[in-house]
Amino acid sequence: MISAKCFTQEWVEEKSIELGIRDKNLIEKVIHAFSLLDLLAQSGCPFHFKGGTSLMLILGKATNRLSIDIDIMCPPGTQIEQYLNNLSQNGFLRYEMVERKQAGKNVPKSHSKFFYQVAYKGAKDVESFILLDVLYEDCHYEQVQEVEIDSSFITTEGKKHLVKVPSVGDILGDKLTAFAPETTGVPYFKKGKSSSLEIIKQLYDIGRLFERVDDLAITARAFKSIAEIELGYRGLPLDVSIIYDDIRNTALNLSLRGFIDQDKFALLQDGINRFKPFVYNTSYYIENAIVDASKAAYLATLLKHKVMKVEKYSGDLSSLPDMATVNDWPNKLNKLKKLNPEAYFYWVKAFTVV
């Protein structure tokens, strides 16, 4: 169980100094996210842990980003409410079910808010909350592993609990379907509000997962399985190629800084700016996002053409072909050769897969 001292002002301030994170609100949210995960692990709830916070366990410190929600997958018919006991022992005051179904779509989800008393401000009556998103589906991951709930943000007392998480290859396939705002991914707007921050979170995660894969066999199967389910929920044709194109087009618009669609680029740029507090021990600017976009486009192209080997940038561009002879190559990408050579490398690879 997570130690009660993790919910104190002293602990939050200690972690702020230790990890170099100014936003104590985010630190406290991360701590409570892990506490909710620990509660679920103790409860016997049948679930697989997915989403951004799961990467803090799968990738460890390599993720360098804060995630403050819990996303899980439960078998259809699971009554999640029966597992939400012992809230006070896990640092929570209460929870509220927000909705059982996503408006306008047939996605079998539930959303709950878990409220806790804010410690870092030293105020007794200030509350905040974290979200639990539950997707009611059978597990579609090919490889699942059990990992301990362990992080530099928390300390535990007694035995550390285990949770089931997807492999790097599986969750990369999942994340790629989420970085497709016009089809299966996080849309530009939800209920009239910009979701660009969530889009950039998917992009950032793809960039970190990219470094852990050399073969896309597992990713390809996970992508196809998840993509077909998501297309079905949205009433779209069961043609995964529209997702590949969506990923590439979104990535290209970002890399060309809005040359294709200035309004959508402005949204993505705003998402990058709002994402900055969520990374630590590193920085994340438009140039970093362009590199990650080039990786996403390259991966989408490899999957589309059923090429499983991933080539990685070594710092050498001398082996790349002359792009003047390549059909459909956007000449504006040539600027990246000097300004952002890593992004240029992956864009060349994306346009020369076949």
Over which residues does each language-model region extend?
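Penicillin-binding protein/beta-lactamase superfamily catalytic region
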Residues: E287
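Catalytic cores of NTP-dependent nucleotidyl/adenyl transfer enzymes across multiple folds
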Residues: A4, K15, K24, V30-F34, ...
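Helical scaffold of the NTase/Pol beta-like nucleotidyltransferase catalytic core
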Residues: M1-H48
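Short histidine-centered catalytic/ligand-binding loop motif
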Residues: L19-R22, D71-T78, G192-K193
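Metal-dependent nucleotidyltransferase catalytic core
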Residues: C74-P108
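Active-site nucleotide-donor binding segment shared across nucleotidyl transfer reactions
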Residues: L37-I70, C74-P76
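Short, conserved acidic/polar surface loops in the N-terminal third of protein domains
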Residues: L59-A62, Q82-N86, Q143-E146
